[in-house]
């Protein structure tokens, strides 16, 4: 349907976005980037084009290009009303959990985090948290914001952020981020989560990449270096190379 709509009217912004998103879901990232680039030429003031192209620049590890796109998107949404972003792959309740503004700040923060520009990552995540208006988006943002604050040795701010997290949060899809945050709070048994992580049937799932990076990072943070590195190596040995947790594991394992 996305391709048919695009072929019928390739200048329509929504058609461009959905066709580009579909191409990306099929792993055709370079083609998706080309579609969004065309969309930018046609709709240079549409922040959505930069947001989606930036996402695929992230996927393909073109981090500086991703940052440029997300910064442009951020400048285009100033003083504009936020809007919920429809999911390409809906969750179990078919309820979108992220908005245009939250996605722009979230992905910009991630791009800065992956390039080790933690000051700018923290600023982006702070803005993202302010527009994370449901528990799912909140825990996803809090996860990366917490890691960033720790990198900056802002331990008091990191601990204060953790205090806003609790087991009773009603989530639709981001339960893995909550699990990891509860491990950081020492309210979730890391060894039990590790046992589940090592279950071969789960290897390669997106969930396992998210849990794996969080778990590996936790073990590194408490001085269990061998265990931490082993888990991170397992994350990047699995096929979820397009996930943000995989990218972060790559970065953590860099010499």
Predicted regions located by residue number:
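Short coil turns that delineate tetratricopeptide repeat
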Residues: 10, 44, 78, 99, ...
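Canonical positions in the second alpha-helix
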Residues: 5, 38-39, 72-73, 94, ...
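Residue-level recognition of tetratricopeptide repeat
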Residues: 21, 55, 110, 147-150, ...
């Amino acid at each position: 349907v996305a391709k048919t709509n695009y072929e019928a009217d390739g200048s329509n912004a929504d058609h461009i976005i959905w066709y580009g998103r579909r191409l990306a879901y099929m792993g055709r990232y370079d083609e998706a980037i080309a579609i969004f680039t065309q969309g930018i030429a046609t709709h240079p003031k549409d922040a959505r084009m930069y947001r989606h192209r930036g996402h695929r620049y992230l996927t393909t590890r073109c981090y500086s290009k991703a940052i440029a796109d997300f910064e442009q998107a951020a400048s285009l949404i100033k003083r504009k009303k936020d809007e919920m972003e429809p999911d390409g792959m809906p969750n179990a309740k078919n309820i979108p959990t992220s908005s245009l503004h939250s996605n722009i700040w979230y992905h910009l923060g991630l791009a800065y985090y992956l390039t080790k520009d933690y000051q700018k990552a923290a600023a982006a995540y702070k803005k993202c948290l302010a527009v994370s208006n449901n528990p799912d988006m909140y825990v996803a943002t809090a996860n990366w914001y917490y890691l960033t604050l720790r990198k900056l040795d802002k331990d008091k701010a990191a601990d204060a952020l953790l205090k806003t997290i609790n087991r009773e949060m009603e989530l639709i899809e981001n339960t893995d981020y909550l699990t990891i945050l509860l491990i950081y709070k020492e309210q979730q048994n890391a060894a039990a989560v590790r046992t589940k992580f090592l279950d071969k049937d789960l290897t390669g799932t997106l969930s396992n990449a998210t849990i794996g990076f969080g778990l590996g990072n936790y073990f590194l943070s408490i001085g269990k270096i061998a265990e931490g590195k082993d888990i991170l190596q397992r994350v990047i040995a699995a096929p979820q190379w397009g996930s943000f947790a995989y990218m972060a594991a790559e970065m953590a394992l860099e010499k």
